[in-house]
Amino acid sequence: EATPERLASADFSDPYYTDIPPMILVKADNAAQYATLADFDGKSVGAQAATTKETVVTDQLPGANLVSLSLVTDLVNELVYGKVDAVVLDGAVAQEYAETNPDLAIAPASSELGEAQPYCIAVAKGDPKGLLPAINEAIAKMQSENKLDDFITAANELSGKAVDVTADDSAV
C-alpha cells in the first residue's frame, strides 16, 4: 500500500487496487465483546509482518500486544486455535475468512479503523531504472481489459479458502 510513510523511501506506480477498509477478524463467539478499539487493550492482535496492518495495530490499537507472522494463513490458524485474540487483515480478505469459516467473524470495532490505502507497485526512490512508465502502462492495459478486477476477485476468494480450519484441530 502506498502510504505517506512509504512514499518517503520509495516511488510508486499508479494505483491498481483499493481494498475496502481493514477489518479485525475474531472468533465468532467473542465478536460482541469487541465493540470499540479500546476493547483490544491487553489482547494479542496479529498482523502480517512488514505490512501496513502492523502499523494499524501499533497506531490504532496501542494497548494491544502485536503478534507479527509472515503468512496470513498462519495468523488465522493462531486465531482459530486461541493463540491470538484477533487478526487485522485487508478488508476483503477478512470478509472472505468470516464468510467461509463460521467460527470467525468481523469485530464490530472494525468500523473505527479508517480508510484503506491504494495498492501500487514500489520502485526505488527516484526510479533510477525508469521502470514506472512501463509499469503504469501495463496497469492501465490490464485495467482496461478488466484483468486486474478478475485477478483480485479470484485472489480474495482463494484467500478465505486457503486453509479451511475448525477449532477441533481438523483441517478441511
What name fits each language-model region?
Residues 17, 53-71, 98-102:
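Ligand-binding cleft/hinge of the Venus flytrap
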Residues 37-50:
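Short loop->beta-strand "edge-of-pocket" segments that line small-molecule binding or catalytic clefts
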Residues 1-39:
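Acidic, polar ligand-binding/catalytic clefts
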Residues 32-33, 67-81, 92:
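Short helix-initiation/N-cap motifs at beta->coil->alpha
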Residues 18-26, 53, 95, 99-172:
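Periplasmic-binding protein-like
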Residues 1-9, 56-59, 85-115:
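A ligand-binding cleft/hinge motif common to bilobed small-molecule-binding domains
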Residues 40, 79-80, 121, 135:
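Hydrophobic residues within well-ordered alpha-helices
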